[in-house]
Amino acid sequence: MPTWADLSSSALLPHFKLLWGFHHNPAANEYTGLIAGGHVSEWLGANFWGARLQDIHPPHVVTEARRFFDHILTAPAAGRCSGRLFTMGGKPVTGERIALPLAPDGTHPGGILGATDYAYVPVSGAVELIHENVEWFAI
């Protein structure tokens, strides 16, 4: 399984605006923001880097995100969502999201690299994640 160090910054750079990532601390059972591309930065600003999942989203969203992330790490599997990805200011935003496990030691999953592509909606307001039309791909 790839590690963060295996990722080529030159290969990822053209897609950086789509990327996001979390580190998982199994002892604390916490996910911490690690990579925030342009799209995530637009919603959350500097609040993503180093922030715990529960500090970024409301409790009901955290529960669903944890379920999604936990499956990625424990299966391990790649996850794909399509259709409604989130709401912004109550308006649905559609697109596609993928999330892949990463292993700090090359063997045991402990991080997630994701990419989200969507049609930009010029609205503002609270952002709430949606995991719709989820597909799993065993790794």
Positions of predicted regions on the chain:
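Intrinsically disordered, low-complexity terminal regulatory regions
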Residues: 1-47, 51-55, 63-139
